[in-house]
Amino acid sequence: MNRKIVIAVAFILSACAVSAQLKEFALTDEWVQKIEKLAPAKAEVQPKKHHKVLVFSLFTGFDHWVVPHTDAVMKVLAEKTGAFEVEFSKDIYQFEKKNLKNFDAVVLNNNCSVGPRRDLLLDVLDKDKNLSDDQRKKKAAELESNLIDYVKKGGGLMVVHGAIVMQNNSMAFSEMVGGSFDYHPVQQEITLELCEPNHPLVKAFGGKTFVHVDEPYLFNNAYTQKNFRPLLYMDTSKLTKKTKEIDEKIKYVSWIKKFGKGRVFYVSPSHNAQSFEDGRLLKFYLDGAQYVLGDLKCDDSPMKMEDNGKQ
């Protein structure tokens, strides 16, 4: 009898783990209409000027099925609130200096690169047979440098989920974004806590946790410096199916930071379009976009190292 109970419990736990892998679905007009209804009616701050935002959605590595849904979310937020105008592109030459000047901010949408090199720009340039190997490497470095300089000089940058992998082995890119992708345990239900419940950037959550199914991203490189203002965190002791021990109980999954004269917003949620079916995440995205555009003012001073892991 006891053995049967153990087997039954094991089966239930296994079923729960499998169910955490949400079903993918194609972007449809019906889904977009649902998002339009859930999205904020107006922006938190009325923009003082017209903003144009580049949404870059090219990937060469892992194909996140949520890419078109994330594009749609940014379009809905822009059109419904009038907070900014969006232009979509998968052309790396948008990172030429003359082109970046046309935008007030850039949104990087799940731009996963091919491992282990992890250089999306070089992935694309490798296909250009008119260039030598040296020319490809030089151009890739130039385009990356252009984006970094753009933010340093005052441009905004919003980095969504897997986009942190775009130039994952570049320390310069890591320092701009606030970290690099390390790995993630399997998809599972994650409870995201608010680092500062009264911070303007987490107003969307109304002081409550945000529970959803996602990949629990963990980070390295510049992340260890904690040179950012954390917004959301997860308790790693509650994660399941960890392939190795995690060094800190608290890991941040979203933050803001100054970078030169510019502003950066990293948001790990979400791998799944279902997460956007909660209006709170839509407002969080909108507020983050308004932050990088300079409209939503808030404390973005870096956390103190001695505060790491304390809430």
Task: Please state what every model-predicted region is.
Residues 82-96:
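A short, well-structured beta->alpha microelement
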Residues 53-54, 100-167, 261:
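Short alpha-beta junction capping motif
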Residues 32-39, 174-175, 179-260:
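Catalytic beta-strand/loop cores that center a nucleophilic Ser/Cys/Thr
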Residues 50-61:
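Short beta-strand segments enriched in small/hydrophobic residues
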Residues 59-62, 92-94, 111-115, 157, ...:
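Solvent-exposed loop/turn segments at secondary-structure junctions
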Residues 1-22:
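Bacterial Sec-dependent N-terminal signal peptides
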Residues 21-48, 68, 76-81, 238-240, ...:
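Extracellular ligand-binding/catalytic regions of CAZymes and related secreted enzymes
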